[in-house]
Amino acid sequence: MNKTKLLKVLFYLNIAVVVGLIGYKVYLNLVTSEFEAEHTEQLSDISARLEGQDSYSFAVVGNINNSVGIFERRIIPMLNDTDIDFLVSAGNAVSSGGEDKYRAIKGTLSRLDMPYLLTFGNNEYEEFGSFRFYDHYGPHFFSFTADDSRFIFLDSTGKTPWQWQLRWLTDILKADDSKHRFVFIGHPP
């Protein structure tokens, strides 16, 4: 008889956990605000911010996921107290590709007083994260120019074949006369 009661309790606990997880997923998708193509907005902000300037500066951070608390409490206030024009994350801004992780990093980065761009890294790729990254931020590899510099973001996760990216990169660089080129990649291929 005790075994039956224990199994009933475990069954109802499992049901409660499943209902809780489903409720959380529904909350994430219906209640929290949607965001998409964030890089488009960030690139517009970078262009507007740099317009008419003779020079600019940017900061590069990596693996925000390892210390989100420190990043929020110490790094963001320090960055906001500088004249830095924009921030680049060199990959692994999220701890996994889950929807909740993307929403959390959006909340964290919204505390910055400057535009930001993310490099598509291994953690962004995990748990179907590549689809979320594409929906929330944009393509896994892209480039933009600022003054006499070209900024190039590549996908080293294997999601986008290297041959495709190298062809794209070759075409861009053939027509590019930028004085400086900055390449961001989550990790060496």
Give the positions of each predicted feature.
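Glycine/proline-rich, flexible active-site/cofactor-binding loop segments
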Residues: 15-26, 176-178, 183-185
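N-terminal active-site segment of His-dependent metallophosphoesterases
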Residues: 22-104
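Extended active-site neighborhood of metal-dependent phosphoesterases/phosphodiesterases
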Residues: 34-35, 39-42, 52, 99-181
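Active-site neighborhood of phospho(di)ester-bond hydrolases with catalytic His/Asp-centered motifs
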Residues: 60-62, 86-92, 115-122, 154, ...
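Solvent-exposed loop/turn segments at secondary-structure junctions
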Residues: 64-67, 93-96, 122-126, 157-160, ...
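N-terminal Sec-pathway targeting helices
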Residues: 1-18
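Short, well-ordered secondary-structure micro-motifs
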Residues: 3, 12, 84, 129-131, ...
